Swiss-Prot record:
Organism name: Thermosynechococcus vestitus (strain NIES-2133 / IAM M-273 / BP-1)
A molecular function (GO) term: ATP-dependent protein folding chaperone
NCBIfam families linked to this entry: GroEL, PRK00013.1, PRK12849.1, PRK12850.1, PRK12851.1
Name of the protein in its database record: Chaperonin GroEL 2
Binding positions (ATP): 29-32, 86-90, 413, 478-480, 494
Pfam families per record: Cpn60_TCP1
Length: 543
């Protein structure tokens, strides 16, 4: 495949055109009065969205050079979304401002490497400033953060605030699509995993097809149980105690399963068998989690235990067990609090060390199941288009809330960056002249989010920036009401982590674009001409 190569100014200008095409489509969504963008879909109805990263992912440009710029800009949004799940539009607006001013200076002959160095030093000063001014989240701030992030939707704010209050900061909140018009929340207490009963003959409530057991013993093993002989000593002990039994094993089959079913149907023993959750090493870890939560032991040959050795003291205990054909929920207060806390600390350590997004998600889920539970928000709406938009807003709000809990909050509406820009003046004397130019570019770009929020609200961006700059740190423009006020008192707050990530990712991409001297893209292949349609052949003569 042949390649096209562009150099110097030509390469940078092509990148800038692509960057502007994407940024101009994304930035109109910023703020409470941000506009919507309609995305055409190959199949189904067009999608109406107000979410920066979703718009960025849809943009592909015809010109290969310009498309490269658009893809770089998409990376800013995607990276910010991966780290904090919100702030993608702010990152895009900042990156566009940094690149626009930076390219003017590179074209005028400034050394791009020195320019980049100055920008990096200025951004570090601002990042340190964000950490200094951030305040911990307290009271109704969680609802305020969620409301702002969901595009000023107080209902969303209240729901996420309630979910956070119920499951705690280590809990897991998931967002699903609802079958109804209402948006509702469901709290799952205790430990839930995606494995149901092995046989429907175990059900205790035939109408709902579920198993409901109270004050049950739990036998946990990583073995496959096929012979009933292994289980007889345990079954006899549990039967004498008069309590139900839940068996969680790799599998229960053959003679063992048949005997358990017969005993259940005859009323000799109230029992249910469930396959252990997950696979391989993760299965062993999850069994251990269940054991710690229920005060039991995992019967495993790795620790020298077999099913014949089981005593009642080795079994876990649960105050309530609910098993459907797909899920199991265990509620137990029998676990040792110190052991549970130790296990949670261990999992948090693993969470800090892993780079895999999948592993992070699974570890976070395991922590949540140990400490408090899971909240499921089911999003409802009148049309599918509205449902998709509402779900995206809820996801943004949830991510912003988690970020606020992690690193605290700062005044919103873009004013934190605008007010911190003055700190760059103190940095200038220590920089070389060309580095100073880079630092000044950052200082002027920090006004871009405030200006864009004002423009989207129908105000004059440059005027708003000057008015806000004259006020104290919390003072800013409330685009929802058109008033200048103390934004923290008005509940307009941003998570510090979102503001920090947006600035760092914007600076990273801007630095790369400014130091680009050549651009290599694939040469588009000419489309083959459509073949001419042949005429119909004549009919042969009849004999």
């Amino acid at each position: 495949m042949a390649k096209l190569v562009a150099f110097h100014e030509e390469s940078r200008r092509s990148l800038e055109r692509g960057i502007n095409a994407l940024a101009d489509a994304v930035k109109i969504t910023l703020g409470p009065k941000g506009r919507n963008v309609v995305l055409e879909k190959k199949y189904g109805a067009p999608q109406i969205v107000n979410d920066g990263v979703t718009i960025a992912k849809e943009i592909e440009l015809e010109d290969a050079y310009e498309n490269t710029g658009a893809q770089l800009m998409r990376e800013v949004a995607a990276k910010t979304n991966d780290v904090v799940g919100d702030g993608t539009t702010t990152a895009t607006v900042l990156a566009q401002a940094l690149i626009r001013e930076g390219l003017k200076n590179v074209a005028a002959g400034t050394n791009p490497i020195a320019l980049k160095r100055g920008m990096e030093k200025a951004i570090k000063t601002i990042v340190d400033g964000i950490a200094e001014v951030a305040k911990p989240v307290e009271g109704d701030m969680i609802a305020q953060v969620a409301t702002v992030s969901a595009g000023n939707d107080p209902e969303v704010g209240a729901m996420i605030s309630e979910a956070m209050a119920k499951v705690g900061k280590d809990g897991v909140i998931t967002i699903e699509e609802s079958k109804s018009l209402q948006t509702e929340m469901e709290i799952v207490e205790g430990m839930q995993f995606d494995r149901g009963y092995i046989s429907p003959y175990f059900v205790t409530d035939p109408e709902r097809m579920i198993v409901q057991l109270n004050n049950a013993y739990l036998l946990l093993t990583d073995k496959k149980i096929t012979s009933i002989q292994d289980l007889i000593p345990t079954l006899e002990r549990v039967a004498r105690s008069g309590r139900p039994l839940v068996i969680i094993a790799e599998d229960v089959e053959g003679e063992a399963l048949a005997t358990l079913v017969v005993n259940k149907l005859r009323g000799v023993l109230n029992v249910v068998a469930v396959k252990a959750p997950a696979f391989g090493e993760r299965r062993k870890a999850m069994l251990q989690d269940i054991a710690i939560l229920t005060g039991g032991q995992v019967i495993s040959e790795e620790v020298g235990l077999t099913l014949e050795d089981v005593e009642l003291t080795m079994l876990g205990e649960a105050s309530s067990v609910t098993v459907t054909k797909d899920t199991t929920i265990l509620v137990s207060e029998k676990g040792n609090k110190a052991d549970i806390q130790k296990r949670v600390e261990q999992l948090k350590q693993q969470l800090a060390e892993t780079d895999s997004e999948y592993d992070k998600e699974k570890l976070q889920e395991r922590i949540a199941k140990l400490v408090g539970g899971v909240a499921v928000i089911k999003v409802g709406a009148a049309t599918e288009t509205e449902l998709k938009d509402r779900k995206l807003r809820l996801e943004d709000a949830l991510n912003a809330t988690k970020a606020a809990v992690a690193e605290g909050i700062v005044p919103g509406g873009g004013v934190t960056l605008l007010h911190l820009a003055s700190r760059i003046d103190a940095l200038l004397p220590s920089l070389s002249p060309e580095e100073q130019t880079g630092a000044r570019i950052v200082a002027s770009a920090l006004a871009a989010p405030v200006a864009q929020i004002a423009d989207n609200a129908g105000a004059e961006g440059a005027v708003v920036v000057e008015n806000v700059r004259a006020g104290d740190f919390n003072y800013g423009f409330n685009a929802a009401t058109g008033a200048y006020e103390d934004l923290v008192s008005a509940g307009i707050i941003d998570p510090a982590k979102v503001v920090r990530s947006a600035l760092q990712n914007a600076g990273s991409i801007a630095g790369m674009v400014l130091t680009t001297e050549a651009l290599v893209v694939e040469k588009p292949e000419p489309k083959p001409a459509a073949p001419a349609n042949g005429g119909m052949g004549g009919m042969g003569g009849m004999m």
